[in-house]
Amino acid sequence: MKTLSPTGYGLLLVLPLLLAVLQSTTAHKNDINIYSLTVDSKVSSRFAHTVVTSRVVNKGSAVQEATFQMELPKKAFITNFSMIIDGVTYPGNIKEKAAAQEQYSAVARGESAGLVRATGRKTEQFQVAVSVAPAAKVTFELVYEELLARHLGVYELLLKIQPQQLVKHLQMDIHIFEPQGISFLETESTFMTNELAEALTISQNKTKAHIRFKPTLSQQQKSPEQQETVLDGNFIVRYDVNRTVTGGSIQIENGYFVHYFAPEVWSAIPKNVIFVIDTSGSMRGRKIQQTREALIKILGDLGSRDQFNLVSFSGEAPRRRAVAASAENVEEAKSYAAEIHAQGGTNINDAMLMAVQLLERANREELLPARSVTFIILLTDGDPTVGETNPSKIQKNVREAIDGQHSLFCLGFGFDVPYAFLEKMALENGGLARRIYEDSDSALQLEDFYQEVANPLLRLVAFEYPSNAVEEVTQDNFRLFFKGSELVVAGKLRDQSPDVLSAKVRGQLHMENVTFVMESRVAEQEAEFLSPKYIFHSFMERLWAYLTIQQLLAQTVSASDAEKKALEARALSLSLNYSFVTPLTSMVITKPEGQEQSQVAEKPVENGNRQGNTHSGHSSFQFHSVGDRTSRLTGGSSVDPVFSHRRGWKGQAQGFEKMSYLPPRLGPPGPLQPTRFSHPFSRITLDRVLPEVLSVPDETSHDMDSRIIGATIPPPPARIQAPSVILPLPGQSVDQLCVDLKHSQGPVKLLSDPGQGVEVTGHYEREKARFSWIEVTFKHPPLQVRASLEHIVVIRNRQSSAYKWKETLYSVMPGLKITMDKAGLLLLSSPNRVTIGLLSWDGPGKGLRLLLRDTDHFSSQISGTFGQFYQDVVWGPPAAADDSKRTVTVQGHDHSATRELKLDYQEGSPGKEISCWTVVL
């Protein structure tokens, strides 16, 4: 984490989506001490009001600078910030941006304050510094608000905690109040230990939930001997609400209403989707590889009633015909996607026009399903370089070609992409833009975006209210409604409005129109929000203002100059009236006399190729290459040189540019000398540390070490390997069994137990003797965990969350707990269930390993390659004098079992040697 100043303090708190960060900036943690830090977040009907309060004291003997640094979600609006120093409050004042800059420039001589900047995928960073006298105390308080959006069926609050020091009073409280009722609630943490879990309490009833985290000093410590904190990571709350057949809920508070609408009772409308893929040279390498992976997965998720096209462009856009998503066509398209290569220029204009032409031609020829929806998904990573390159002209061409008939979604890959250009083009055509961050999970980001739009349930959705009942209503017409999302409309009740607010929502299903009728009694709804414990005053009015401002700002992107001026004027007025820091306003922060008198906090706007100090949300690292051509080899390393049998080898193997390793010299100890050899070695294993650097012999070196010529090199002893799996067998004469897969290749069903509601499959690579991936699927809760050598992906409600191996994880949901420790052991457990473990094994036979615990919970329905050993297993008598061989009968089939030395991987690398009965399958 970045250090901002010689002294300071900190805590990173993220709540998306709620998010806040107070980060340590001190090299001397005892000087600036955080003695109290509290987070209070009240979520009332999806609208989150978060207050972060930090109290610090300067324990040093000199003046110290304390830097208050926080991260908050990009869609959140700061509403207040203040500092209390020696009993005097220094508030932040929100003003029009131009006026705030003028005030600041008068003090700072025109220098930019830079108090808020974009930092991550979903976050912005706020920071302010103040000098603190010895023994003086400072209280910082930041308030921000956000409407939580429903994403793939869940609302999410995320807290990222990194105090970097022990805090005497650390407390986080999250109150959730949902009048519709909370259907499920789950928590996840990347720092939680069993001891810390005792500081977490969750209470919940039908409509309310309270989550409190209040660790003691001892619970925060890494160990009793260390004064360092273990708090370093994420804490996440996910939930959803109950829904009626109508899918809607009208809620009223203090003269304002909000209407939530999310029906999920029909099958999806057939869709016709054109994927326009940038295959220009700038996409080569990791980008095009991840694009191929995502496309193959997305194609497999197409519905049988869907139609699709693939359009790639690389200087010229090749034409491809529209096809139905039949199994044959999907497999053909997957093969095509797997062969996509990056080369040439970026021809956005022609590729986009061709995509529209394909849809129009299919429509004219009546090839598209009746009343289906059509949209185009564009993925690109750079500016147009071939054909039409003027962004405004491309936008005009695309807008005229689409003519309101299709929806356009633009995905910008990386930070070199012209995001403002893509955003305007998408919004002008009924879609949206999304940035895809260059990272190990880029393919997952693409897949997740597709899942958001994969299931359109309604089209042309319109909300209607009596004109004598409401006014100043937010957007009430929507082109599409997708499964897992939510449409939100808010407004103001008229002074003489009826006692009952009625509403109609009209939309189109696949083959019919539908109208939803809802009513809400004003007095009853007002009574729902009387409890001050769970709501803050006039929250629904602020929700209405927040939503109105967000929509006005979105409209300015594609508006004409005259329209833009009017939209911005209204958004500015609301921002000032409700004290929101938006792209049109700034917060002027005053300081004590003698310090820099004021600073300005502004809302960053994502409208350029690169946003100043924007990063992907991960730390930056510097990589240094070694300049010399030698390598130091250490004990236990192994190298696999392959040398040509051809004559005339001149200091290097055929097909290799250079060689930087040689075998250890045979014979008595002595100084290491460069050696040459005249015959190939297929493998050389170095089992000791070589004290000198070995270099490649030059071309003129023809002397052979006499001790190597004619010497017999004994083969290295075979390493003890970890088996494919170790199966605990409770209640049998053999307490555990090692199973090696020697004859399997490709997907293997390892376990299937309908009684437990679990299935485990894996992909076995016979040549490498390892699993390349293992997938665990649970029926209740519906969840899938897919582990590869690189990372773990948890999929729930079509939403993917990726985790790196050896990251601490602690997730509790109804019916399942997921944990992972620093050793990389992932455990999936639940009462009265078999515990399934996954491990990325770094020892000999590197690869994924499966662990099983509590196997007595398997039902009589268990089956599979490994599961069969929990059904009707009979061990025969010893078949050898030394009791090293036995026969084991499994479901009537005999298998030979041999007692062998194996590495037990169950506690991680390096493993320990065990004697284990081994069966080869």
Curated annotation (Swiss-Prot):
Signal sequence, start to end: 1-27
The VIT domain, residue ranges: 28-146
Keywords on record: Acute phase, Disulfide bond, Glycoprotein, Protease inhibitor, Secreted, Serine protease inhibitor, Signal
UniProt domain VWFA: residue ranges: 270-428
Tissues expressing the protein: Liver specific.
Domain of life per record: Eukaryota
Cellular compartments annotated: Secreted
Bias kind Polar residues: ranges: 608-623
SUPFAM superfamilies, alphabetized: vWA-like
Region Disordered: start-end pairs: 591-646
PTM info: Appears to be both N- and O-glycosylated. Cleaved by plasma kallikrein to yield 55- and 25-kDa fragments.
Keyword 4Fe-4S among record annotations: no
Glycosylated sites: N80, N205, N242, N513, N577, T712
Pfam families from the UniProt entry: ITI_HC_C, VIT, VWA
Family that this chain belongs to: Belongs to the ITIH family.
This protein's name: Inter-alpha-trypsin inhibitor heavy chain H4
Organism this protein belongs to: Sus scrofa (Pig)
